[in-house]
């Protein structure tokens, strides 16, 4: 773990010594060839810190995933009490994710508020079309705008990274409409670089698998309800109890399509484990259970979307 206080040349806040960061990054190192090097990554970190200092205050839309956790942690280190992390709690947030996000914020002593959002009450969200994520973020950012006004905070930011700009992310449109900033993307930080920096900072979330909201497991066109989300959450938690780490339970009505990381598939294909998976998903309320031979793929539900929709990306 990096001693950020020593590396930053001071009390861990407001430091800007690039030599300390470069030394720390070099000592931590990374074996991933897709991360171009400690110096380039450290330069992006400096750009991120400079941007945060420029803002002077920021409210971070915080989910507990590696991107928003790293952004919130960096904002806390740079701005101290002039930042506030806000965690939106709703039926689409797994209880496991809520607990982990809260624990991480508490471990840093980071200012945190947990608010309730009711996106399921919005028909445009519940009908679950290709713009579901837009409506979710529209609700979230509207609530954050109101809260920021009450707290006297001028800026709102979220954890979009540089890779996200190349994917279908309708939430980006909501961010643009609400003038929500994306400091990680502005600094050019990719997911792999964020993981490397989070690891160097000693953040336990550095290798946490991506955990989008539970609604992302529901096939497009199927109404999202609390019962459906609870069913998905029960199913996924049961599979974690069986020892699987990176997985999705895709909800296709009476059928559960299980995606498991390819390096874990062999263990899933034993007769004993297939019986256990089937029993767990049936206990969660599914009548049919199928194992996707392609393994886990982030955003696999988007495969059914028309090309012209995917081409919009964040537009």
Regions found by a protein language model. Give the residues of each.
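ATP-dependent adenylation/nucleotidyltransferase module used to activate substrates
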Residues: 24-200, 256, 275-286, 295, ...
């Amino acid at each position: 773990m990096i001693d950020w206080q020593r590396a930053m040349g001071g009390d861990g806040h407001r430091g800007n010594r690039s030599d300390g960061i470069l030394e720390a990054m070099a000592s931590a190192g990374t074996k991933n060839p897709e991360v171009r090097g400690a110096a380039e990554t450290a330069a992006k970190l400096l750009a991120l810190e400079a941007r945060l200092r420029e803002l002077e205050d920021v409210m971070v839309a915080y989910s507990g995933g590696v991107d928003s956790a790293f952004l919130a942690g960096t904002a806390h280190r740079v701005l101290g009490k002039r930042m506030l992390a806000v965690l939106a709690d709703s039926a689409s947030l797994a209880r496991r994710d809520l607990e982990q996000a809260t624990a991480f914020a508490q471990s840093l002593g980071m200012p945190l508020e947990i608010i309730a959002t009711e996106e399921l009450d919005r028909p445009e969200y519940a009908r679950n079309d290709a713009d579901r994520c837009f409506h979710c973020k529209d609700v979230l950012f509207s609530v954050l705008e109101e809260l920021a006004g009450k707290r006297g905070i001028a800026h709102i930011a979220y954890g979009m990274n540089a890779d996200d700009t190349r994917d279908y992310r309708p939430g980006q449109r909501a961010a643009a409409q609400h003038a929500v900033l994306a400091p990680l993307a502005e600094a050019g930080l990719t997911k792999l670089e964020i993981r490397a920096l989070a690891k160097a900072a000693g953040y336990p979330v550095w290798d946490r698998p991506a955990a989008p909201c539970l609604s992302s497991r529901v096939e497009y066109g199927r109404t999202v309800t609390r019962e459906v989300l609870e069913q998905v959450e029960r199913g996924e938690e049961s599979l974690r109890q069986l020892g699987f780490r990176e997985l999705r339970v895709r909800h296709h009505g009476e059928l559960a399509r299980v995606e498991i990381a390819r390096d874990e598939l062999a263990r899933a294909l034993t007769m004993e484990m297939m019986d256990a998976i089937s029993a767990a998903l049936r206990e969660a309320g599914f009548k049919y259970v199928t194992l996707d031979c392609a393994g886990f793929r982030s955003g696999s539900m988007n495969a059914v979307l028309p090309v012209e929709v995917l081409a919009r990306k964040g537009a």
